[in-house]
């Protein structure tokens, strides 16, 4: 079992992911990528600069050529990885976690982020890396035009004329995150009228918690209603996750953003759709309407991008509002998802688009649980579920999904936080709530 790598890289507070640790980890990562050409990017967290310095020192001392992209969104960094054909990328980010967290997200040259399993291989190199000779240390190169290059690539995939003609009014809640480096500029250039809130990057996240949950974006919801905006958009801290508020002020959950993205993509081009076992069945229903296949993976971006790299998928997405557009990268790109949906609402309102998505009720909750107790909770859930009958499947070592007619529930040990996540879905709200309550109670008693 990997000690430090979770479902999406390494995360922790400065105590666990400090400069000495980051230096050692970066040396091991550099060696894993054969000491080649490595990109480094970071978000704007308070510990970002010190970890960046340690990561760069680690890579350089392992003999890598380092290109520093500076502060960018994760999707921008992952787009640049493909564009610059580098051997690997380290993004210093803790995504949507609280301010005191930071982490290392590691992506290989194919654009696939390093999973727990592959992380275990890297961990074996910790402390065992042969340092480069004095004469072969390479200077660090800066690269300051990533946002511009990412924007140009996105614009080439859109129809800016349609947006410029309609001039939609959009409110952006940047959550004091890195989307400030790109999202307002892109939407302005596309011809939108925009209003931004929480728009300065601030590692204290003074405006709202970084995770774009409904309870965290109440200000955006209120402003969309008051100003009669065409929609509101909110991202997490590093810009891979996105949620919407429709023109009536309704929160649009990540599953629906994902299903709508699939609908928009398949209208243009048919192909396989990749999603995780924790995503709403609405995605599969949309794909079936177009006669397209849905491929399910374990929860975690690495598993989705792995399938996408080796198959014929035209789009991928997961329930938190992360959508992969393979023409740009194999990473979740919340910036392009924003632009794509903004383009669609120039044709008809967001609420009208959402009527085309099959209605399911989703209930999501979490139960606090230490790392030590996660296995015991999952074992208990397994015993309970299998004794009741129905289709019960384990997905990897961290999730159990129980399928009944027209409803399902997944119980999953979080790979990034000390908690168990429980998501349920059904055709009726009562049924979804009852299903989630049953497993929430059980998990609580076992945690
Ligand atoms: Mg994120």
Q: Regions from the language model: what does each represent?
A:
Residues 86-101, 224-246, 251, 294-333:
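Glycine-rich phosphate-binding loop
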Residues 1-63, 68, 87, 137-170:
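An N-terminal, well-structured beta->alpha segment
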């Amino acid at each position: 079992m990997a000690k430090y790598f979770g479902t999406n890289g390494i995360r922790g507070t400065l105590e666990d992911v400090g400069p000495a640790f980051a230096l050692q980890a970066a040396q091991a990562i550099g060696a894993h990528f054969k000491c080649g050409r490595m990109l480094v990017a970071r978000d704007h967290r308070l510990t970002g600069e010190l970890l960046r310095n340690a990561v760069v020192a680690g890579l350089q001392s392992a003999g890598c050529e380092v290109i520093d992209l500076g502060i960018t969104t994760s999707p921008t960094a992952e787009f640049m990885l493909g564009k610059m054909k580098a051997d690997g990328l380290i993004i210093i980010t803790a995504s949507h976690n609280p301010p005191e967290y930071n982490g290392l997200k590691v992506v290989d040259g194919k654009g696939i982020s390093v999973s727990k399993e592959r992380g275990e291989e890297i961990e074996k190199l910790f402390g065992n890396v042969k340092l480069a000779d004095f004469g072969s240390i390479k200077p660090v190169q800066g690269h300051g035009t990533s946002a511009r290059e990412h924007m140009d690539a996105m614009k080439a995939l859109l129809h800016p004329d349609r947006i410029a003609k309609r001039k939609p009014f959009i409110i952006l809640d940047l959550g004091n995150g890195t989307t400030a480096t790109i999202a307002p500029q892109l939407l302005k250039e596309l011809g939108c009228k925009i209003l931004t809130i929480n728009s300065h990057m601030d590692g204290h996240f003074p405006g709202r918690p970084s995770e774009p949950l409904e309870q965290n974006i109440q200000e955006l919801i209120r402003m969309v209603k008051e100003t009669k905006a065409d929609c509101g958009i909110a991202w997490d801290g590093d810009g891979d996750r996105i949620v919407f508020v429709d023109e009536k002020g309704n929160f649009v959950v990540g599953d629906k953003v994902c299903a709508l993205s699939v609908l928009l993509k398949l209208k243009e081009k048919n192909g396989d759709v990749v999603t995780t076992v924790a995503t709403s069945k609405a995605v599969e229903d949309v794909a079936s309407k177009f006669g397209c296949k849905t491929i399910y993976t374990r929860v975690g971006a690495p598993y989705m991008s792995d399938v996408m790299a080796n198959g014929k998928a035209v789009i991928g997405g997961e329930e938190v509002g992360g959508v992969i557009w393979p023409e740009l990268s194999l990473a979740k790109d919340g910036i392009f998802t924003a632009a794509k949906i903004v383009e669609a609402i120039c044709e008809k309102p967001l609420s009208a688009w959402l009527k085309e998505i099959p209605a399911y009720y989703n209930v999501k909750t979490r139960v606090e649980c230490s790392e030590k107790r996660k296995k015991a909770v999952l074992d208990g859930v397994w015993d309970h579920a299998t004794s009741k009958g129905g289709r019960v499947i384990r997905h990897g070592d961290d999730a159990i999904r129980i399928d009944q007619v027209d409803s399902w529930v997944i119980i999953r040990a979080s790979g990034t936080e000390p908690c168990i996540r429980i998501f349920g879905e059904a055709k009726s709200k009562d049924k979804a709530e009852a299903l989630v309550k049953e497993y929430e109670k059980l998990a609580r008693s076992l945690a």
